[in-house]
From Swiss-Prot:
Keywords tagged on the record: ATP-binding, Cytoplasm, DNA synthesis, Kinase, Metal-binding, Nucleotide-binding, Plasmid, Transferase, Zinc
Positions annotated as active site in the UniProt record: E87 (proton acceptor)
The keyword Kinase is assigned to this record: yes
Source species, domain of life: Bacteria
Cellular-component GO terms for this entry: cytosol
Family per similarity comment: Belongs to the thymidine kinase family.
Protein name (Swiss-Prot/TrEMBL): Thymidine kinase
Source species of the chain: Bacillus subtilis subsp. natto
Length: 195
């Protein structure tokens, strides 16, 4: 299976890893980035926290037919030999299933990069699907430390912070900017102010 899933918490370096992997890959390749607001086929950019960026083509999570059409165009009409997808957690499970099917049918590797957990501690549907179907050697977990002050534990949760405290309820997909921290379980489940 030529499919990988690179997953970690917010700020763990997934986009940095995608850019690194993309730049050292000698094959013809294309980078795609999943968006909640931009149209499929529009130009996008994958940015890492270290300031580096990579041009990409946007996939809108709600435009299933256009996303499949785009992938088919990439596979059938270009010389693309590898596909990199950033923010894959935003894709619906059905889109990931179709992408996996196309990848296997036409032997074009796809590398997914995305979060596994929502801020409520539940798996994203697409991430759950990838974690279920892929063998462990095709899953790369990228870890990072807890962002709570003076904590040296490994973070396990993406915490949405509201009024300085962890919020564990609300809509998963919000278009306005929210504030998130990567926290260990002790700080995630502690109801005291984090910041």
């Amino acid at each position: 299976m030529d499919i990988t899933f690179n997953t970690g918490l917010m700020g763990s370096g997934k986009s940095k890893k995608l850019i690194d992997d993309y730049l050292i890959d000698p094959k013809e390749k294309v980078a795609l980035s999943v968006s909640l607001t931009e149209d499929t086929f529009s130009r996008g950019k994958i940015e890492s926290r270290d300031g580096r960026s990579l041009r990409s083509i946007n996939l809108n999570r709600d435009q299933f037919k256009q996303n499949i059409s785009l992938l088919e165009i990439i596979i059938f009409m270009t010389n693309t030999q590898t596909i990199y997808i950033d923010e894959s957690q935003f894709l619906p499970k059905e889109t990931v299933e179709k992408f996996v099917s196309l990848s296997e049918s036409y032997h074009v590797p796809i590398h997914f990069y995305g979060l596994d957990l929502t801020f409520t501690g539940e798996l994203f549907d697409s991430s759950s699907h990838l974690l279920t179907i892929l063998p462990s050697e095709n899953i790369n977990r990228i870890s990072r430390g807890c962002e709570a002050s003076k904590c040296s534990k490994i973070a396990q949760y993406n915490a949405r912070i509201v009024d300085g405290k962890v919020s564990r309820s609300g809509e998963t997909f919000v278009e306005e900017k929210s504030y998130y921290l990567a926290l260990c379980s002790d700080h995630y489940y502690n109801d005291e102010k984090i910041i």
